[in-house]
Amino acid sequence: MRKHFLLSFVMMAFAFISCSANNTGSEGSSPVSDKKADNKMTQVKLETTLGDIIVELYNETPQHRDNFIKLVKEGYYDGVLFHRVIKDFMIQTGDGNSKTAGPETMLGDGDPGYTIEAEFVYPKYFHKRGALAAARTGDQVNPERRSSGSQFYIVTGKIYSSEELNMMAKRMTDIKKQDIFRRLVTENRAKIEELQRNQDNAGIQALQNELIQITEAEAAKTPSSMTDEQIDAYTSVGGTPHLDGQYTVFGEVIKGMDVVDKIQNTQTGAADRPTTDIKIIKASILN
């Protein structure tokens, strides 16, 4: 990263070092399930009021896979609404409270009472059109990016040009470096406060330069440039590349994207909830 990019962020981070970070992330752990003995991927049918959607669950995300299978077998998803629908972005469901929700009820907080550890298999699995991913709370209250125990979304997204993807990759790199630097500042909080108390400007400058160098080196280990597969998908079928590496992608739609499109094109009202309820009538394991 060029030094001038970080300067304003660096000075702000040092100036507000005395402010406490909010790290009250979601607690709880997911239920333990048996792992599949073979490499065959589980398929799940979602019978909705607008048609059937069939998804396939990735074996490389075993906690999410096993939890999804568990909830399907328990009937947790039977009757839940697609409570958040944004055209050219995604359709979201899995809020257990939505089964009996009235038309004015605000939804999005319902879950089984636990979260799931993030399972990022990136860049192999990314937010292409049709991707199945776990919803979660934001980074400020969930720095570990743990997934909701039940809520998930299916990506619809949009098609991007190569130029747009290049610009997005640069922004993602900048955000990553800011996150790294913020963590380093927190880790060096005591040292920074001591330098500030002693009014050691030279020491502060030296530490700032050191943290910038560490940030550069750490960010370089995981470049934000997209793979050929990502570029091909995002420039042909589309998706939501800005979510990559931030939310767990644990499966994909293998049949029924026409139904997904029907859902994403429905009229919505407050909080992006469809004005006419669209629900999962029944979820079932196919194999």
Which residues does each predicted region cover?
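Positively charged n-region of N-terminal signal peptides that target proteins for export
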Residues: 1-4
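Sec-dependent N-terminal signal peptides
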Residues: 6-12
